[in-house]
């Protein structure tokens, strides 16, 4: 009898496992779809069309038919018959229909939709087509938990509406929806007997919420005004309503265990441990408590939060939870790790019995030494197979699914991370993206169920995201030569041999980084606090980059008025000046070390001129303006004090990133206004100090100079309230031509040269007490 039971169990288990593997985890993930009616999704999809091409929207008819294609995958069908006026598009969801509409615009009308600008010139006669496309996987995912702070933090509903439209146009059917959670925590903490002061000292300012949520730090940039909570609740309802109307599944947050310091006072018997010091944040802002997931209080708090969240926003049964982001558990004991993950999951299922836990897989990259195979297997497999969905967060450079054996049976999404900190700088690993998605999808016994975009910041290098979104339907790698030619045509609105040559050079150069260990944190010499010991590696042929610049400028007669052409010309000019700035730095440092005053002074003056030119060209384009970032922040304030607080948050994040420069320049931005009022003053002070050392024959004091830069430039910039333009200043094309005339002949660096520079993620300074006390003022006022 016992043998029969064992055989029966084996048959059931084997059948179940094969069913999961063969049907994309249908049993455990099949319920992850919105419950919105076909009629509502149809109307929402047509709404996207109206907002995008209002004058031509009547030429397109979108409908939803969930039975159009195979279960578990999205399908769209596009039909435009000869002589007919209307293009009919049917999709299995609102997202699928909208995706099909974008596919038609892109590949039949040669149009372009992007974060930068749109090119929507439709042909007089719409092309005929009869095409059916089915997605390659179950999911197309979007967002990184950090994107909410680096890019989305100051968005109003109009900007969110545009982004949700963009998601649908690109087939995104799974996305984070993190707005408003602090308002929920406010309610929960009050029910748990915390005072308002307890809560205020824990919740960070808006620009730093992502890292407060993950337990990396607390309180900095706060306190959060009540108006922020009210606004974010309203905004989250708008976001969720629209996502669900279109068929996009929102991923809500779950309790990860990070709690305010007040928990120690209120719950002295609970198992609480201080989180580790993250990036040298001092005690005032570091180290919240971690409530051990195995403690009964964890389930209580987690259930309270999730119940309150669902009562407010509803649910689609998938929750993100990252307990150990850039932190490690207190022990590597396998039993403990299994208990921890099981307890985290149980806190979800106590409220939602069909909950799926989404885990960002960054911990397996960032703390690889801790997360060995045994530790990872123990942590992952204590959750039922298929009830955890893992984001393989940086698959294009650091895929973990091979090392961790397809996450020991848990499904995962192949993600392109691509960007850290929302920094600017031309970069891509285009060959990796074009090949490795299919390696993951075709892996024997693999558990890949989707593709994803997981940048820390957006509004940069759109070409990489345009390609990556296509991996959701492609069944084999793209012909990149052809693809880049078509990209230039779509983006600028016409065929031009010079634009095509420019993009082919960029494809094979700056967008084809083949070094998996390349540090792509956007750490460029001119953007960082000056020192004598900096190095930077240029992985591409800078001669070819300069040739691309020549070619793109030669396309100006045809595309002078094209918004995306102007953007790209500014961006490429910015990259050229960035590279040249690194060259000048290397030359002047060598001259300083050799005591050659003449060469030093010549190159120091050239660097000052270069930075002025950089600010000039950046200020000519809407997408590179500090003023837009600051005004968006202030617009959310309901009082002068709130506007002041939000502006401080906005300025600090892109410069000091912390009260004392804990993550200095990690999220630096090459924007007009930042260069002139932050980068250039730092370089002026540094170059003046070096010059004095040479002329007067006294030793250069790097520590003293860094302290001066901190106190005289960096801190004042974060506290300043000067206004900056929100509209472009000057003609981008004409300014780029002038910059080209000045600098083109001086571009001579050979490919692969190392420029002295090496960056540490943490570079905080020691300053006197009372020197940096803005937060006490804000706290008193709120």
Predicted regions and their residues:
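Catalytic-core regions of glycoside hydrolase
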Residues: 57-59, 63, 111-126, 132, ...
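C-terminal GPI-anchoring signal of eukaryotic secretory precursors
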Residues: 755-772, 778
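C-terminal substrate/ligand-recognition segments
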Residues: 535-560, 565, 570-593
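Contiguous, structured surface segment used for ligand recognition
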Residues: 2, 6, 16-137
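Acidic/histidine-rich, surface-exposed loop or edge segments in extracytoplasmic proteins
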Residues: 23-34, 80-84, 144-148, 220, ...
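Active-site-adjacent substrate/metal-binding segments within catalytic domains
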Residues: 137-156, 167
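Cleavable N-terminal signal peptides of Sec/SRP-targeted secreted and luminal proteins
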Residues: 5-22, 770-779
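Extended, compositionally biased alpha-helical segments that mediate assembly or anchoring
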Residues: 671, 675-759
């Amino acid at each position: 009898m016992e043998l029969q039971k064992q055989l029966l169990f084996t048959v059931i288990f084997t059948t179940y496992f094969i069913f999961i593997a063969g049907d994309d985890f249908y049993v455990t993930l099949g319920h992850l779809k919105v419950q919105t009616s076909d009629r509502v999704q149809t109307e929402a999809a047509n709404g996207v069309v109206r907002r995008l091409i209002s004058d031509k929207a009547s030429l397109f008819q979108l409908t939803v038919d969930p039975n159009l294609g195979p279960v578990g995958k999205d399908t769209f069908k596009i039909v435009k018959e000869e002589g007919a006026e209307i293009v009919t598009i049917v999709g299995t969801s609102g997202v699928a229909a909208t995706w099909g509409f974008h596919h038609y615009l892109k590949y039949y009308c040669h149009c372009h939709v992007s974060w930068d600008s749109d090119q929507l010139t439709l042909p007089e006669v719409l092309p005929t087509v009869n095409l059916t496309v089915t997605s390659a996987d179950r999911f197309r995912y979007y967002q990184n938990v950090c994107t909410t702070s680096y890019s989305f933090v100051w968005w109003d509903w109009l900007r969110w509406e545009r982004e949700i439209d963009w998601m649908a146009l690109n087939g995104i059917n799974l996305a984070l929806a993190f707005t408003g959670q602090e308002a929920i925590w406010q309610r929960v903490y009050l029910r748990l007997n915390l005072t308002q002061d307890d809560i205020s000292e824990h919740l960070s300012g808006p620009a730093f919420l992502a890292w407060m949520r993950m337990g990396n730090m607390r309180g900095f940039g706060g306190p959060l005004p009540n108006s922020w909570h009210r606004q974010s609740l309203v905004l989250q309802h708008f976001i969720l309503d629209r996502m669900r109307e279109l068929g996009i599944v929102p991923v809500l947050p779950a309790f990860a265990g990070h709690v305010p310091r007040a928990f120690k006072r209120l719950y002295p018997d609970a198992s609480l441990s201080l989180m580790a010091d993250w990036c040298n944040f001092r005690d005032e802002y570091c180290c919240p408590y971690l409530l051990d997931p195995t403690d009964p209080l964890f389930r209580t708090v987690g259930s309270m939060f999730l119940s309150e969240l669902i009562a407010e926003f509803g649910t689609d049964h998938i929750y993100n939870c990252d307990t150990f982001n850039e932190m490690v558990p207190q022990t590597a004991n396998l039993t403990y790790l299994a208990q921890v993950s099981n307890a985290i999951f149980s806190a979800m299922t106590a409220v939602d019995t069909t909950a799926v836990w989404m885990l960002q897989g960054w911990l397996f990259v960032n703390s690889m030494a801790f997360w060995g195979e045994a530790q990872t297997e123990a942590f992952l497999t204590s959750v039922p197979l298929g009830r955890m969905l893992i984001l393989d967060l940086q698959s294009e450079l650091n895929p973990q699914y091979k090392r961790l054996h397809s996450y020991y049976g848990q499904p995962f999404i192949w993600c392109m991370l691509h960007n850290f900190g929302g920094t600017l700088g031309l970069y891509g690993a285009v060959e990796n993206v074009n090949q490795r998605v299919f390696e993951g999808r075709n892996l024997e016994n693999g558990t890949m169920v989707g593709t994803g975009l997981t940048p820390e910041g957006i509004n940069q290098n759109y070409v990489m995201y345009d390609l990556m979104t296509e991996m959701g339907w492609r069944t084999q790698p793209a012909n990149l030569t052809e693809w880049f030619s078509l990209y230039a045509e779509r983006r600028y609105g016409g065929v031009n041999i010079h634009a095509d040559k420019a993009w082919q050079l960029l494809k094979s150069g700056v967008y084809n980084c083949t070094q998996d260990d390349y540090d792509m944190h956007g750490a460029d010499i001119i953007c960082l606090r000056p020192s004598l010991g900096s190095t930077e590696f240029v992985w591409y042929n800078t001669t070819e980059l300069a040739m691309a610049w020549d070619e793109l400028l030669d396309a100006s007669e045809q595309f002078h008025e094209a918004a995306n052409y102007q953007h790209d010309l500014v961006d490429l000019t910015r990259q050229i000046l960035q590279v040249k700035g690194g060259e000048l730095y290397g030359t002047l440092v060598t001259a300083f070390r050799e005591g050659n005053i003449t060469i030093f002074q010549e190159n120091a003056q050239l660097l000052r001129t270069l930075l002025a030119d950089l600010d000039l060209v950046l200020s000519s384009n809407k997408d590179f303006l500090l003023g837009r970032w600051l005004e968006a922040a202030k617009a959310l304030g309901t009082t002068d004090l709130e506007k002041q607080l939000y502006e401080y948050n906005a300025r600090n994040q892109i410069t000091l990133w912390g009260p004392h420069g804990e993550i200095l320049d990690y999220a630096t931005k090459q924007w007009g206004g930042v260069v002139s009022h932050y980068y250039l003053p730092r370089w002026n002070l540094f170059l003046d100090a070096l010059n004095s050392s040479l002329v007067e024959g006294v030793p250069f004091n790097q520590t003293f100079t860094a302290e001066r830069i901190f106190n005289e430039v960096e801190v004042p910039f974060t506290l300043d309230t000067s206004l900056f333009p929100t509209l472009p200043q000057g003609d981008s094309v004409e300014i780029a031509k002038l910059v080209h005339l000045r600098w083109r002949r001086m571009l001579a660096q050979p490919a692969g040269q190392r420029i002295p520079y090496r960056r540490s993620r943490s570079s905080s300074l020691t300053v006197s007490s009372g020197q940096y006390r803005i937060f006490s003022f804000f706290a008193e006022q709120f």
